[in-house]
Design a protein with these regions (language model features):
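Betabetaalpha-Me/HNH-type nuclease active-site subdomain
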Residues: 24-110
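C-terminal, well-folded lobe of enzymatic/effector domains
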Residues: 107-164
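Short hydrophobic alpha-helical membrane-entry/anchor segments
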Residues: 20-21
């Protein structure tokens, strides 16, 4: 009954139910070297399947794909060390745009994705740089995993991340 209280709950659950059939949410193990193979990720950024899903749900005019770790950091040293695929579907969060927030009747505090988000990107860069300073590979991997999940957990209502 959560969707009656908070309409955005339904929007998010729809995405989670559909994507969770195809994605493994395995925490630290998902950051193993070579774990993000391009050929076995049906819903990676700009894939045909991802576009078709949004068309099927009639979301295509109302949402944008947000990279949790922004594309501009695909060559960051930490991202390279961890062999993290920026375009993997685990790094993409479907977010409503301004029109979508209204049309989909989402909660007023729901974040919208409309173009660039400088403060968010600088926040991510600062943390990537900090994690890179950790001496051990496993420590870097673990800290990155914690940070990555923190970002994903806070993208709906902007509880603890800067935006715009």
């Amino acid at each position: 009954m959560g969707w009656l209280i908070n309409p955005s709950f339904f929007f998010i659950c729809t995405n989670l139910i559909y994507f969770s059939k195809y994605q493994l949410h395995s925490g630290v193990s998902s950051l193993r070297p070579n774990s993000f193979f391009k050929n076995d990720d049906m819903f990676r950024y700009n894939s045909k399947e991802r576009r078709n899903f949004k068309l099927l749900k009639n979301y295509n005019k109302y949402v944008e794909d947000h990279h949790c770790i922004p594309k501009q950091f695909k060559n960051h040293t930490l991202i390279k060390i961890l062999n993290f695929d920026i375009n993997n579907s685990k790094n993409i969060y479907i977010m409503p745009n301004k029109k979508g927030k209204s049309i989909l009747n989402l909660h007023p505090d729901t974040l919208v994705h409309q173009g660039y988000h400088y403060k968010y990107n600088m926040f991510v860069k600062e943390h990537l740089d900090y994690i890179l300073l950790k001496p051990e590979y496993d420590e870097k991997k673990y800290e990155f995993w914690l940070f990555f999940n923190h970002l994903k957990d806070n993208l709906q209502f902007n509880n603890n991340i800067p935006w715009k």
